[in-house]
Amino acid sequence: MLTFLKTLFQPKQTNAALAWAAIQNKAGNKATSGYWLYAAPVHLVLQRDSFSLGAPAPLTLEADEIQALTNALNLHFNQDTGENNVQFFWHENVLFLRLDTNPNITTNAPQAALNKDINAFLPKGEGAIKWAKFTNEVQMLLFEHPVNLAREANKQATINSAWCYGLGKIE
């Protein structure tokens, strides 16, 4: 009975990231097997004792910003191994993340957390602690990235995190 009630009240997971990956895979493009998520570039706002997710989410980026951030993230997460265990892809104004291994998390779309304390909306599950470390690493890389320094100088919201959601697997 509890399982049935959870299905009624828990937010549905969006699998559009998986759908995009499947289409790309069939077309012979970038999508490869693995675990796929959206990775929405967002701006977290420091509140008195928490962070909230600032609107809009995802942030709108220029092509040069997208390219620079995607390159920096991919270089950082794959520099030690030379493998592509973690890959960020930008396609039609949407950022995707592909992982080799299941992160074992459940996620929420950023729209659910807009202008709210994000703690209730952060990924949950067996892999949540490891995921928090990964997210923190992304945030540290973004903090002083030249794209964000330029955005800050232009009085634009900085991209200080990636909100990942919509987990799905491609075989």
Descriptions of predicted regions:
Residues 28, 33-34, 50, 63-69, ...:
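Soluble secreted/lumenal catalytic domains
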Residues 44-57, 94-95, 113-121:
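Glycine-rich, often proline-containing surface loops adjacent to acidic residues and nearby aromatics
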Residues 42-46, 162, 171:
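Broad, structure-driven detector of short, well-ordered beta-strand segments within folded domains
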Residues 56, 98-103:
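Secondary-structure transition/turn motif
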Residues 85-98:
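Short, glycine/charge-rich beta-strand/loop segments that flank catalytic centers
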Residues 58-88, 145-161:
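Extended, Lys/Arg-enriched charged tracts that mediate electrostatic binding to polyanionic substrates
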Residues 1-66:
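An N-terminal, globular interaction/scaffold subdomain
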Residues 101-170:
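Loop-centered beta-sheet repeat module
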